[in-house]
A protein has these predicted regions:
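Short amphipathic alpha-helix that is part of the acyltransferase structural core
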Residues: 1-23, 39, 134-136, 146-166
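A short helix-loop-beta-strand connector motif used in the catalytic cores of GNAT acetyltransferases and
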Residues: 27-37, 130
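Conserved beta-strand in the GNAT
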Residues: 37, 42-52, 56-63
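Conserved acetyl-CoA-binding loop-helix of GNAT-fold acetyltransferases
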Residues: 64, 70-83
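Conserved GNAT acetyl-CoA-binding A-motif
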Residues: 85-100
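Conserved catalytic-core motifs of GNAT/GCN5-like acyltransferases
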Residues: 92, 105, 109-129
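Intrinsically disordered, low-complexity, charge-dense segments enriched in Lys/Arg
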Residues: 112, 126-129, 133-139, 143, ...
Length: 166
């Protein structure tokens, strides 16, 4: 349930990458948005939130409970999602500035995503926040500048309800 999932999101993501609880819950009414809770042997273990946008899948959040990390479970879930959706995939990642962010990028790379170096700014997730510098990773391949601009524009308008130019 949402009330099981949201605490995992709060523990796995910085406040700059997560909406307020009721704003996150309101997304459940969005036609392109899907929130999945994954159970392992009956126990809630992981979650991912996706947006099915035109010809690509945008993964907004992906988190595995701490006790299920580092055993290949997250990778198995990601691979299953990719196999099921059969469409290009996009995920935002933090800049590779420290060991943790480099490890996250490496996780996605091991599952076939490519780090794109185009400067990307995530619109604010909460009132009063500024933009967040991130990068896009894509599968099955790196994207050209035209595709990057199209993905960025669609993510900003559909996911963040932001119509400006960042």
């Amino acid at each position: 349930t949402f009330d099981e999932i949201f605490p995992l999101l709060e523990s796995a993501f910085p406040v700059t990458e997560l909406r307020m609880k009721e704003d996150q819950r309101a997304l459940l009414k969005e036609p392109c948005y899907r929130l999945y809770g994954v159970r392992r042997e009956g126990t809630f273990a992981a979650t991912f939130a996706t947006w099915e946008i035109e010809d690509f899948l945008y993964i907004e959040h992906f988190a595995v409970k701490e006790e299920y990390r580092n055993g290949g479970y997250g990778g198995m879930l990601l691979d299953a999602l990719l196999a099921e959706k059969k469409r290009p995939m996009v995920v935002e990642v933090e800049l590779p500035e420290d060991a943790l962010t480099r490890r996250r990028i490496g996780f996605y790379e091991r599952h076939g995503l490519v780090f794109n170096s185009y400067p990307y700014l995530q619109p604010p997730m909460r009132k009063g926040q500024g933009v967040l510098p991130l990068r896009l990773m894509t599968k099955p391949a790196a994207i050209d500048a035209k595709t990057y601009q199209r993905y960025k524009k669609r993510i900003h308008s559909i996911v963040y309800k932001y119509e400006g130019d960042l």
